[in-house]
Amino acid sequence: MKHRKGRVEGEILRELTKIIRKNIRDPRVSNVTFTAVECSNDFSYATVYYSLLTEDEQAQKEAEAGLEKAKGTMRHLLGQSLTMYKVPELIFKRDQSVIYGSKIDRLLADLKKQEQDRQN
């Protein structure tokens, strides 16, 4: 059963990525990238994790509002492309791992710069 769940999550991720690029014209979601999907055991809910290229708080709120507005359309189009009995309800959550990774990159760059300053 776990293998099927993984396949379904991967297929939902691929289809949602296609849908947001081709069918959703809202400029608020133009910088959104879906990173992962986790489905409930009965496939009634799908938590979709997304990231943004910007760390601007206003852009994050706008992207969240855009995703919520497009949720119904995305679910409808997802239902047309998937061969499932029931299309899962979509729940969008911000993926914090991208922010965490960029923070670590900045810290490492700062450490490297400090090390170079000490040597000079």
Swiss-Prot record:
One of several proteins that assist in the late maturation steps of the functional core of the 30S ribosomal subunit. Associates with free 30S ribosomal subunits (but not with 30S subunits that are part of 70S ribosomes or polysomes). Required for efficient processing of 16S rRNA. May interact with the 5'-terminal helix region of 16S rRNA. Monomer. Binds 30S ribosomal subunits, but not 50S ribosomal subunits or 70S ribosomes. Disulfide bonds: none annotated. It is found in: Cytoplasm. One of its GO terms (molecular function) is ribosomal small subunit binding. One of its GO terms (biological process) is maturation of SSU-rRNA. Keywords: Cytoplasm, Ribosome biogenesis. GO terms for cellular component: cytosol. The keyword Cytoplasm applies. PANTHER family: RIBOSOME-BINDING FACTOR A, CHLOROPLASTIC-RELATED (PTHR33515:SF1). The gene is rbfA. The keyword Cytoplasm applies. This is Ribosome-binding factor A.
